[in-house]
């Protein structure tokens, strides 16, 4: 690369996408700077999203497990923890993650610059530093990995102390008895699980007709039933007309005429890209209505020297995929093309209580495609390992082609689902006839394990053939 610029590449953002790009670039010998607007590296994933919410979920699920276990619990006195106590656990995990990721940059001699970046021209950035000064930086190429933030409608007062989004909920200081959650997407469902697990009343407002409609319908129905059984009130096909804040809580007026009152509101309906402060108009780039950028298969924007990865390009908006996108973009940036590509079937992990995970096609998709598939199921309650640890709620479902035995989709509902799914994913990715449900019958599993669910499901499915 020519060395007439300060850097070969500047990466804007240090979340999973930015980290993947930065590490990929420095490993190829590029001079790289990473710009991070906040004091610590890691981005929204580490500080407000994936890591803290999953740490919260883990703490709450352990409390539920303790209270439901007859060996350890005294049913005259349930174990309880305050939201602040559980947040302390999340803070400890965040600190560990931050130190680890900071070490990645230091060991690889990748410069971290703190401040807000904005484009001046095609190869120049202005960096607004925390001390009020402004630095000018130049680079031959750029990677935009600035992430996303919760969408804020203009008619909702997010400055009110009882109205939260999925970022600010982590700074909640009071103990709510009743929570309204508007938006029943992944974030809304995960927090519904967390609050209900803390014995908080939850009203979950869904703007659609069922939960997480992109899932296999049985998985969606399982979550709905589990929420209903645990006391979460789900209100489908509802939209708010206005949100009224008061000293002791929030009143939500729905377009259907209903009124709901709770101690606080978590607004979790949509996200928008963090592109509004980048002055993209100065380099001729435009975003869509959600602040997202369009890219090609190598993550190039309409400006060939500017790449974008992660939440800022939309689907799939997963930390795991963002890291791979950054790595692929780094390869394309240095070599002009990328030999690596994002896998076709990206696994989905949803950290409700219990978890949901899936990879590949759903039953609804296969039916619409007129694919002759069969189903193999394993109920967790029939597995020795699940009985030992008390994980009786859950199921593993394998969808496979009736004739070729090729695995077409795997769906799991239950504790550890996000871990269990990867066993099946590994077989699905095999080439040359290696992707077959018969693998699970012909291999030997440790016993007792949750992985054994694959053998049970495979036998169940193969026994349906005639």
Curated annotation (Swiss-Prot):
Sorted UniProt keywords: Cytoplasm, FAD, Flavoprotein, NAD, NADP, Oxidoreductase
Cofactor(s) demanded: FAD
Gene Ontology CC terms: cytosol
Highest taxon of source: Bacteria
Cystine pairings recorded for this chain: none
Claim: Chaperone is one of the keywords in the record: no
InterPro entries: Class-I_Pyr_Nuc-Dis_Oxidored, FAD/NAD-bd_sf, FAD/NAD-binding_dom, FAD/NAD-linked_Rdtase_dimer_sf, Pyr_nuc-diS_OxRdtase, Pyr_nucl-diS_OxRdtase_dimer, STH_gammaproteobact
Predominant location: cytoplasm
Molecular-function GO term, any one: dihydrolipoyl dehydrogenase (NADH) activity
Gene Ontology biological-process entries: 2-oxoglutarate metabolic process; NADP metabolic process
UniProt catalytic activity: NAD(+) + NADPH = NADH + NADP(+)
Pfam families: Pyr_redox_2, Pyr_redox_dim
Note on cofactor: Binds 1 FAD per subunit.
Positions annotated to bind FAD: 36-45
Enzyme Commission (EC) number: 1.6.1.1
Annotated compartments: Cytoplasm
Similarity comment: Belongs to the class-I pyridine nucleotide-disulfide oxidoreductase family.
Role noted for this protein: Conversion of NADPH, generated by peripheral catabolic pathways, to NADH, which can enter the respiratory chain for energy generation.
PANTHER family noted in UniProt: DISULFIDE OXIDOREDUCTASE, SOLUBLE PYRIDINE NUCLEOTIDE TRANSHYDROGENASE
Subunit comment: Homooligomer; probable homooctamer.
NCBIfam families: PRK05249.1
The protein's name in its UniProt record: Soluble pyridine nucleotide transhydrogenase
Biological source species: Shigella flexneri
Name of the gene: sthA
